[in-house]
């Protein structure tokens, strides 16, 4: 293989690795965090299981905020979901600490109805 061709291949590989290292791999809908809720208990009131997942396979996610309109802090341990403003519907997951790539954080709450929880904002911590 000629030297110019080797140089071109290595340069292309280096640029690709730089692109991956800058967090570009965690862009787009497929890497957005996901929130899934399921009802897990029917008797003696309703109980809901919430799973929050970092869907990026390469980078931790930090400072994940959820839209949580009307959610009372008393329903869940604040280390899992901290209500910053119930009226504004702003909550932070895991105290803003990182969720590892593909990690799922789960918690339960009991209430007469299910609250709408959805990702509001987040950052990827790619190096």
UniProtKB/Swiss-Prot annotation:
User: Which UniProt key words apply to this protein?
Assistant: Signal
Q: Which residues form the signal peptide?
A: 1-23
Per the UniProt record, one Pfam family is TPD1_C
In terms of domain of life, where is this protein from? Eukaryota
PANTHER family per record:
EXPANSIN-LIKE EG45 DOMAIN-CONTAINING PROTEIN, PROTEIN TAPETUM DETERMINANT 1-LIKE-RELATED
What protein does this entry describe?
Uncharacterized protein At1g05835
Q: Which source organism does the UniProt entry give?
A: Arabidopsis thaliana (Mouse-ear cress)
């Amino acid at each position: 293989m000629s030297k110019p061709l080797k140089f071109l291949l290595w340069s292309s590989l280096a640029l690709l690795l730089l692109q991956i290292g800058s967090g570009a791999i965690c862009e787009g809908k497929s890497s957005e965090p996901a929130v899934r809720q399921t009802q897990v208990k029917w008797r003696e009131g309703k109980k809901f299981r919430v799973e929050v997942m970092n869907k990026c396979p390469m980078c931790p996610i930090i400072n994940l905020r959820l839209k949580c309109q009307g959610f009372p802090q008393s329903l869940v341990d604040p280390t899992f979901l901290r209500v910053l403003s119930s009226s504004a519907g702003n909550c932070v997951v895991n105290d803003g600490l990182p969720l590892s790539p593909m990690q799922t954080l789960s918690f339960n709450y009991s209430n007469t109805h299910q609250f709408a929880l959805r990702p509001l904002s987040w950052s990827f911590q790619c190096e």
